[in-house]
Amino acid sequence: METIFDVKNVSYTYVGKINALNDISFKVMPGEQISIMGSNGSGKSTLLTLLDGLIYPTLGEFYAFDNEISEDVFDAIKDNEFRSYFRKRVGFVFQNSDVQLFSSTVYEEVAFGPLQLNMTLEEVKTRVMEVLEMIGITKLKDRYPHTLSGGEKKKVCIAAVLANNPDVLLLDEPTAGLDPRTQLWLIELLQELGKVGKTIITATHDLETVEQISKRAIVMGEDHRIVVDGNVETVLNNRELLLSTNLIHEHMHVHGKLVHDHLHVHYREHIHEH
């Protein structure tokens, strides 16, 4: 079976010697639904950016579809055949939709990817209209993307990625800033995409989202290392792990003679321990 991603002892340091990833290793197989979990600053977004081939390891090795992803073999050769192959198979939905939107209309935004695949204009039109209908934004096709609401922008970004029909979807904090209805829509969409065999990797600290869209959790600590790589249910039920990685927190309350811990958890009601 093909290996989607193989990350081997990867570290990444930003300019100024700011360490973001520290000796990271894991593999991703086809059809997996994975959440990269961690508090703000743990490196999960950096890791997702690396998986999309936008940055390269400072140390270690990163392979996608059995090809090394590095500046020498991936970025330096602009007409690299594998580069085009990679971009066809991997789609990235950024946390900030405005970073991703650059076309003058929603239609053109969604059409941009298919146009790079040398499809005919008629084929592009068919593909775009199919995706717009699937996402439920056909009525927005002539709108300027930056006039849309946050939820509408997110839908356009997802439509633009899905227009290429990628095998792998990378999503950075996909539910951040969305209203409850749009969050539910997105979760249900990711569930359906998982059922048809898409490989879905999400970076998030929203534990409720993790529980609903992933089967595997990679938890990153504040030292930018992987703390745990395992089953989602097991991870979410590990209170000490969630506390130590700053994914939940607790404080003490006093009510008369009663003292109890107040545990704040993103994916469930507050838990009182007497």
Which residues fall in each region the model found?
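Helix-to-loop junction immediately C-terminal to a conserved catalytic motif
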Residues: 52
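Conserved ABC transporter NBD signature motif
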Residues: 60-74
